[in-house]
């Protein structure tokens, strides 16, 4: 049974390559996969196929968007699909294609899918060392503007099942302190002037391990820099 579905998935992929889905019953395939006890690898393969734009356009033209999306949600839940699987798959498929564009010191820097996944793994390994140091679950806080190192921490947490709490920069020091306490943040990553200012205003009564995402010279307390974190 699975080999038949595997064949049909291969036919869909070939149709995608040929840009012709006229003879492909996507809805029937999704419903069959949804109704049977299918291996996780096949579920992943189906979800891989479903991400192509030509598939979305085909479903939209058939006026079956709601049914399709409901099927996809069910398959995602059954497969336990997660951020790490998504990035890993994109790295395998798109390799050196650009995943992120970053402005760094006024210059455009690109990061490929393969490089991004490698960086996420490196960050995840560093985060796992925190888990080994304690017998209770850790909670990561992110007090930073949108920057690469912060993105890596966020993606690593989502990829490897670590609880992460983004903390808004537009709050007061009282708001920040409240979130740190009530979210039970155990490790806080700090970046940028605003993030640093908020931390300096609340750090005096916090026993939170703090890591600087970039420059740590202006931060108060015992701060681990990014390079030390990755060691």
Residue ranges, per PLM feature:
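Structured binding elements
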Residues: 161
């Amino acid at each position: 049974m699975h080999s038949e579905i595997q064949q049909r998935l291969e036919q869909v992929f070939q149709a995608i390559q040929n840009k012709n889905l006229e003879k492909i019953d996507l809805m029937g395939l999704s419903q069959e996969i949804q109704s049977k006890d299918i291996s996780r690898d096949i579920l992943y393969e189906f979800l891989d196929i479903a991400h192509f734009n030509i598939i979305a356009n085909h479903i939209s033209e058939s006026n079956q968007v709601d049914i399709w999306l409901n099927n996809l949600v069910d398959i995602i839940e059954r497969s336990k699909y997660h951020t790490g699987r998504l990035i890993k798959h994109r790295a395998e498929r798109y390799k050196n294609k650009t995943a992120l564009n970053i402005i760094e010191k006024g210059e455009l820097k690109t990061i490929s899918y393969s490089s991004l996944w490698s960086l996420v793994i490196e960050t995840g390994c560093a985060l796992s060392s925190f888990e080994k140091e304690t017998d209770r679950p850790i909670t990561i806080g992110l007090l930073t503007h949108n920057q690469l190192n912060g993105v890596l921490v966020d993606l690593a947490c989502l990829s490897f099942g670590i609880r992460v709490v983004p903390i808004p920069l537009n709050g007061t020091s009282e708001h920040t302190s409240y979130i740190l306490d009530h979210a039970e943040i155990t490790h806080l990553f700090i970046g940028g002037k605003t993030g640093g200012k908020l931390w300096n205003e609340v750090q005096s009564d916090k026993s939170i391990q703090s890591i600087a995402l970039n420059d740590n010279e202006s931060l108060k307390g015992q701060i681990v820099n990014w390079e030390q974190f990755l060691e």
